[in-house]
UniProtKB/Swiss-Prot annotation:
Protein known as: Maturase K
One GO CC term on file: chloroplast
Keywords attached to this entry: Chloroplast, mRNA processing, Plastid, RNA-binding, tRNA processing
Organism: Sequoia sempervirens
Cellular location(s): Plastid, Chloroplast
InterPro entries attached to this UniProt entry: Domain_X, Maturase_MatK, Maturase_MatK_N
Disulphides: none
Gene Ontology biological-process entries: mRNA processing; RNA splicing; tRNA processing
Function: Usually encoded in the trnK tRNA gene intron. Probably assists in splicing its own and other chloroplast group II introns.
Keyword tRNA processing: yes
A molecular function GO annotation: RNA binding
Similarity comment: Belongs to the intron maturase 2 family. MatK subfamily.
Length: 509
C-alpha cells in the first residue's frame, strides 16, 4: 500500500511537467484575457472590450491551428488569412502568447516554491525596502564589493535549455522554441529592457523570461556559495564529500589539474559573502584580500560563460573597495567610512577611556542629478532657480498642490536614509517656489498675492505628510542623528531609476 501511494505521488508530481494539454482549454485564454484587461488600465468599459476583441470562436480556431500546425515557425505569423479581420489576427497571436505565459507562470511558481523550501530560508522574492537595512547591517563589515550587471542579451536557445530542466513534454518545448525564435528581436539588449519598462503587449512575457533567467542564475550560484562557506568550519579530512566538491569547482571554473590544491581552496576560510539583487544590478559584499576578490570575479565570469554559453563583458563586474570609492546602487552613492567612538570602561577604582573605530555605511543621495532631472521636467532652470510648471496651469489648485505634494513625498520617503538630507530640503525649497509660481501664473498674479490669498494653506496642505511621518517616527533631535528607512517603499523611485541609467551609460562608455 505504501509503495502504491509513493507511485501515485510520483505520478502526480510528473503531471505538472506536461503542460501542452493546458493549451487546449478555452477557460485558460479567458483567464489570460482578464489579466490583460486588469493590467491595461483602459478607460473603456470591460463589456465593450470583451465584445470587441475577445471571441471564443477565435480561441477555438487558435486551438485548432495549434493541433494541426506543421510549420511551427510561422505559428504567430499569419494567424488569420482574412485580411478584413485585423483584430482577430492580432488577438490570435496575443491569445497564444498570453496563454503560454499563464501556463508557464503557474508551473514556475510551483517549481520555485519547492526550491525555496529546500534552501533554508533563502527567498529571492522580497520587497525593496528590505534591501536598505540589509546593506546598513552587512556592508560596514565588508571591505570589498563586486558590482555586477546581469547580461540580458539572451539567445532563445539558452532560454529553451533552461525550460527543459522542468518541462518534460516535447510539444510544449517546440511551441516555446517557435515563439522565442519568432520574438527573438525582443531579446536584444535595448528591446528587452524597453519591453520590461514600458507597458507594451509583450511586457508580461518578457518579464517572465527575465525572471526565469535570473532565477536560474541564482538557483545554481547561491547554493554553491552557501555550501562552500558552510564547509569552511569542517576539517578537510573529516569532510567525505570534499573531493566531489573539488570536482565541481574544477568543472565550473575549469582549473588546470595542477592548480587545484588545498592552499588555493582555503584562501576564503575566514571570509564571508553577502548577495543582494534588484533588477539587473547585483551586489556581492566580501570581506577578504584583494586576491580573493579577483578570484571571485574570475569565477563569476567563467560561470556565465560556461554555464550559459554567454559572453560576459568584463566591464559588467567591477570590484570596488568600499573605504576608498563610491558605488551606485538603487539611486544611492554607497560608501563606508570610519566612525570614532569614545568608550569609558570602569574597572574597580580605575576609569579607562578607549577610542574605538567602527565602520558605518554612508549612503548619499545624488542631489545634482535630481536637480538635473527637475530642470529637465521644467520645475527649475539649469542653475536650480525655480520656475513655473506651465503645463499644469490648466489644472485646479488642489490638483497642482497634490502633484507637488506627491513628488516631494516620494523623494523624501525614498531618500530618508541618506546622510545629506540638507540637499533634500533644498529640493523641497525648489518645489515649494515652483508650486507657488505655477499658481501665480495660473491666476495671473504674483507669488505674494497667491500667498496672501491661500495663507498658510499653501504650506500646510502641500508637504504635510512629511511632518506626520517625522512626528510619528522620531523627534527632531533624533532625526538629525539617525537615518530612517521607510518600510512603505515598494519600488525604485523614478528619479533614482533615471540617475541609475545615467550611471550605467557612463560605465559602458
Amino acid at each position: 500500500m505504501d509503495e502504491l501511494q509513493r507511485n501515485q505521488n510520483k505520478h502526480r508530481s510528473w503531471q505538472q511537467f506536461f503542460l501542452y494539454p493546458l493549451f487546449f482549454r478555452e477557460d485558460l485564454y479567458a483567464i489570460a484575457h482578464d489579466h490583460h484587461l486588469d493590467r491595461s488600465g483602459s478607460s473603456e468599459p470591460t463589456e465593450f472590450l470583451v465584445s470587441r476583441f475577445f471571441s471564443f470562436l477565435t480561441v477555438k480556431r487558435s486551438i485548432r491551428r495549434i493541433r494541426k500546425q506543421k510549420n511551427s515557425i510561422s505559428l504567430l505569423g499569419n494567424c488569420d488569412r482574412n485580411q478584413f479581420i485585423e483584430c482577430n489576427k492580432n488577438f490570435c497571436s496575443k491569445s497564444i502568447l498570453e496563454g503560454l505565459t499563464v501556463v508557464l507562470e503557474v508551473s514556475f511558481a510551483m517549481r520555485s516554491k519547492h526550491f525555496i523550501e529546500g534552501m533554508d530560508g533563502w527567498n529571492s522574492i522580497r520587497s525593496i525596502h528590505c534591501i536598505f537595512p540589509l546593506m546598513e547591517d552587512k556592508l560596514p563589515h565588508s571591505n570589498y564589493i563586486s558590482d555586477i550587471r546581469v547580461p540580458y542579451s539572451i539567445h532563445p536557445e539558452i532560454l529553451v535549455r533552461i525550460f527543459r530542466r522542468w518541462i518534460r513534454d516535447t510539444p510544449s518545448l517546440h511551441l516555446l522554441r517557435s515563439i522565442l525564435h519568432e520574438w527573438k528581436n525582443s531579446f536584444s539588449r535595448e528591446n528587452l529592457q524597453k519591453a520590461i519598462i514600458t507597458q507594451g503587449e509583450n511586457t508580461r512575457f518578457s518579464l517572465f523570461l527575465w525572471n526565469s533567467y535570473v532565477y536560474e542564475c541564482e538557483s545554481f550560484l547561491v547554493p554553491l556559495v552557501k555550501r562552500f562557506f558552510n564547509s569552511q568550519s569542517l576539517l578537510y579530512g573529516s569532510f567525505p564529500d570534499r573531493t566531489h566538491f573539488d570536482k565541481k569547482i574544477k568543472h565550473i571554473v575549469i582549473f588546470p589539474x595542477r592548480q587545484i590544491s588545498t592552499k588555493k581552496i582555503w584562501l576564503l576560510k575566514d571570509s564571508f559573502i553577502h548577495y543582494v539583487r534588484y533588477g539587473e544590478r547585483s551586489l556581492i559584499a566580501l570581506k577578504g584580500t584583494h586576491l580573493e576578490v579577483k578570484k571571485w570575479r574570475y569565477h563569476l565570469l567563467h560561470f556565465w560563460q560556461y554555464y550559459f554559453h554567454l559572453w560576459f563583458q568584463p566591464y559588467r563586474i567591477r570590484s570596488l573597495e568600499l573605504s576608498k570609492t563610491y558605488s551606485s546602487f538603487l539611486g544611492y552613492f554607497l560608501h563606508v567610512k570610519m566612525k570614532p567612538l569614545v568608550v569609558r570602561a570602569k574597572m574597580l577604582d580605575n576609569l579607562f577611556i578607549t577610542d574605538l573605530i567602527t565602520n558605518e555605511l554612508n549612503p548619499i543621495a545624488p542631489i545634482r542629478s535630481i536637480l538635473f532631472f527637475l530642470a529637465k521636467e521644467k520645475f527649475c532652470d539649469i542653475s536650480g532657480w525655480p520656475i513655473s510648471k506651465l503645463s499644469w496651469t490648466s489644472l485646479s489648485d488642489d490638483d497642482i498642490l497634490d502633484r507637488f505634494d506627491r513628488i516631494w513625498i516620494n523623494l523624501f520617503h525614498y531618500y530618508s536614509g541618506s546622510m545629506n538630507r540638507d540637499g533634500l530640503y533644498h529640493i523641497k525649497y525648489i518645489l515649494l517656489l515652483s508650486c507657488a509660481k505655477t499658481l501665480a501664473c495660473k491666476h495671473k498674479s504674483t507669488i505674494r498675492v497667491v500667498r496672501e490669498q491661500l495663507g498658510s494653506e499653501l504650506f500646510t496642505k502641500s508637504f504635510s505628510k512629511e511632518r506626520e511621518f517625522i512626528s510619528s517616527s522620531f523627534s527632531k533631535n533624533r532625526l538629525q542623528r539617525e537615518r530612517i528607512w521607510n518600510s512603505e517603499i515598494s519600488q525604485i523611485n523614478p528619479l533614482a531609476n533615471f540617475w541609475q541609467k545615467m550611471q550605467n551609460k557612463q560605465i559602458e562608455n
